[in-house]
Amino acid sequence: MKNIKLIEVPSEVGAGTRGASLGIDAIKIAALDFMSNFFVHFPSEKIETENKLLFEPIHSPYAKRINGVLNMYEKVSKAVKDTIKNNFFPVVISGDHSNAGGTIAGIKLAKPNSKLGVIWMDAHADLHTPYTTPSGNMHGMPMAAAIAEDNVESKVHELDDKTAALWDQLKQFGKIYPKVLPEDVVFISLRDYEKEEKFLIEKYDMKVITTGELRRKGPENVVRSVLRYLSDCTDIYISFDVDCLDSSISKGTGTPVSNGLKEREAEDLVSKFMQNRKVCCFEITEVNPTLDKENLMAEIAFNILQRSVNVLMMN
């Protein structure tokens, strides 16, 4: 049985649509509606955000609020590192997916010699960089930062010196980089990405499992093949963006995409992954109740969260 600690990160400085900072409270409301004591059952820590930057002018159009994201890396990584060092299992509930870069940094700071595998359950690859981004939103870049990639081969923008320096700081955060090797990343239900991201996926032959492949093979076989693929890794981090779910049930997120996972498919996948003892951290992210109807997205997220943690408790 693992000791669980919840890390709440209500930060949305990396998102393009407002409201993801309210996702954690929406999940807590869902827990109350289900009459669950989940959120009083485990120790928790709430991370102070940089959301005040949302009211200030944007200085880097190709890396919006990157200074705030860098500060969040500092705060999130410290919380994750300390949690692991104290022999707790960090369950991170975050606003937008840029926070995952801080989570990855925290794992590596706690376990600098680990070979970290990442299971990225997301409709998007999040492999953009300030040089390639179509939006400038930092939640589209955490995976590129983790593998310390600029992707200058696909460059669309010229960066000012300050933005370039901040991006370098983000990639090199904690003085460990790359934090993850591209071949140790598995994308699940990836289905919405740009040619610049496709270039990196093909360059590094990164593993992608589509929704169709999952349905053909079934969750059991997919989990087995993913864990076999990551067998050289000493630790595994699972990052669950709710937009990996089909848009019919993921209205309450900033970037819903059709042809995604059904709730049961996602639950089965995550809970089966969680049975593996190499899994050292789980994150769920991008719930945005301002876009939702009757808190459905948060209810689904809570069900996945609760089932995953139940598996950890039994391990």
Residue ranges and their predicted role:
Residues K2-N315:
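Conserved alpha-helical scaffold segments that buttress catalytic/binding sites
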